[in-house]
Every structure is written in C-alpha cells, then in structure tokens.
C-alpha cells in the first residue's frame, strides 16, 4: 500500500 509503505 503506497499510502502507508513503499514496498507493498
């Protein structure tokens, strides 16, 4: 989830 983390 890009809104929370950059990896997933």
UniProtKB/Swiss-Prot annotation:
Give the modified residues of type Glycine amide.
8
**Entry-linked InterPro entries:** Kinin_peptide (IPR013202)
Q: Name one GO cellular component term.
A: extracellular region
Q: Any idea which UniProt keywords this protein has? A: Amidation, Neuropeptide, Secreted
Q: Biological process (GO) annotations?
A: neuropeptide signaling pathway
**UniProt subcellular location:** Secreted
The entry's function note states: This cephalomyotropic peptide stimulates contractile activity of cockroach protodeum (hindgut).
Q: What is this protein called?
A: Leucokinin-1
Q: What is the lineage of its organism?
A: Eukaryota, Metazoa, Ecdysozoa, Arthropoda, Hexapoda
């Amino acid at each position: 989830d890009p809104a929370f983390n950059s990896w997933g």
